[in-house]
Amino acid sequence: MKGINVCRSIAGVIGTASLTTLVWGNCPSGLLALNAITQADAPTAVSENNSSLAPLESSVTATSSTPAPAFQDTELISLVPHQGPENRLAVTLRVNQIPVVTFLGTATELAALSNDQVTDTMERAQTVARRLDELSGAEFFDPSTIKVGLDATTRQLVVKSEDEILLTINKNTVLPEKKLSAPETALQTANRLRRLLGGAEPIVALPAALQVARVNTFDAAATIKRIKGGIASWYGPGFHGRRTANGERFNQNALTAAHRTLPFGTRVKVTNLRNGQSVVVRINDRGPFTGGRVIDLSAGAARAIGIHSSGVGNVALDIVQ
């Protein structure tokens, strides 16, 4: 697999119907504007939308991790960073030059990226792009295995292949051309990937149970009580696929966490006090074992609240239903 070269220096500004796109230098010319999305992607009146992703990891918790190398654009998969709504960073993932899904970040991340700084949103997009590139080159990959499902832990809609979560649908994972409901976003994202990665037939409609899923689990979660917050860290590479303390396989991109005392299965809303971003995680491991830290998040959860790049962050913790 080739690495993904995310173009860095700002080369110019172009306009689109819905946003102004900042184009980073040394990009292939085909990346200079968002392609029109054909109506063939939508088998019904439903549209497509956004993302966040999940593989497997495990038991011993760590206080830091080595980030994966930056993804380099391939002939099939590419990433286009640009200015999104409200001057936020947006990173659009393309397959065969067709925009599939956009990852939304913050205005601070947009400024950081123009200064060559690594951002959580870019890392999240690179993780998805890297895995799609791997799947597309696998000998026995079948694009018809790409479907929409429901994460049993977070109750969020996901796009998956077989039992592997490729990305999670949330408020910061949207369709490039417009923002739709979570079910519509999930359906169109899955159908675009099915078609562009191998010409599989579209999914006509989602089961009724998936059509009412919420975009943000924590919005619907009722707080039972606030517990002691403090410094959160994260762990991932090196533990992926290993057994957690409760016996399951650790998935670094799933929304899970390690806590010293909370019962396994407890759902905890973790809020980054610096930026207000929240995520609901499920406790499936023990830790952290470094003094002064109260919770150890999976890599996916750390990205969701913006502490992946910094390694640690000050958080509030609430037990939720």
From Swiss-Prot:
Single GO term (MF): lytic endotransglycosylase activity
Alphabetized UniProt keyword annotations: Cell wall biogenesis/degradation, Lyase
One GO biological process term: peptidoglycan metabolic process
InterPro entries in the cross-refs: RlpA, RlpA-like_DPBB, RlpA-like_sf, RplA
Cell wall biogenesis/degradation keyword on record: yes
Catalytic activity, EC: 4.2.2.-
Bilayer-spanning residue ranges: none
Pfam families: DPBB_1
Function (record text): Lytic transglycosylase with a strong preference for naked glycan strands that lack stem peptides.
NCBIfam families with a match to the protein in the record: rlpA
Family: Belongs to the RlpA family.
Protein name: Probable endolytic peptidoglycan transglycosylase RlpA
Record gene name: rlpA
